Amino acid sequence: TAIMVGVNTVIQDDPLLTCRLENGENPIRIVCDTDLRTPITSKIIKTANDIKTYIATSSIDESKIALYRKCGCEIIYTKKKGNHIDLMNLMQCLGNMQIDSLLLEGGSAMNWSALEQQIVDEVQIYIAPKIFGGSAKSPVSGQGVAFPNDAIMLKPYAFSQVGNDYFIESEVIYPCLQE
């Protein structure tokens, strides 16, 4: 099992991405970082010698790569799609490494990229019964779609209340696969 984030999440939140359960096993950590901007001082890099950590990148900057390797990170070279990592290519690389289960703990840009490149099979959503409106952050940013028929559909299969929040698990149905 692995957990994946984008470089912006590392820069903004400095997560550790470890298991919080007593005697739990830490997931493999994957940072999608097209241009190698992950701070060497981040928690994820500082703990890379103890917890398997991959940096997925399109960069060939050997001096930066050497710094990450010195900290214990392994590098996954991926193709580029536009200005970002080709996530489908990354999924193929991870599959070749026997990593077949992945939790995307992404920010809105990473979430959109993953949905746009159709690498998401299911989503787990927590919804708080609050309305923010205005310019509040959204869980998915990016280009979006112009027409309702082009929207990515969610087919819920589990729904529960957790405290005051709602938890929904859904299968992702992409437009070309909709009935």
Residue ranges and their predicted role:
Residues 1-179:
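Enzymes that bind and transform nitrogen-containing heteroaromatic metabolites
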